[in-house]
């Protein structure tokens, strides 16, 4: 005799985290597209690398509702730590040279402003998604046996 048990419903914070992670990916893809309009666009190799990274991220994000804790922690480490570092190293390095954000923005064109807005949205989405993945109901969901 076998017994079938229904999978518990995916908690709202986990569902919201999926949406917010996908928004982060969308912001990253949009930023890449905007970079194509700038004087030093990414080359074919960089575009392929980014496409593979984004495809892998989307696969992980879509696996999040499965409740496997390893998926949650993989997202937290790869995107929350490594991905965030990749987003902030360039601006921090630029600021460390004494550059002025006010002067930059005053002289920036539409594409440069779009990059700043998209990068900021990307970072904000990562932070929100991380918080959502570790809300109490999400923690309980990921602790259950799978």
Where are these regions (language model features)?
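Topology signature of small-to-medium multi-pass alpha-helical membrane proteins
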Residues: 1-146
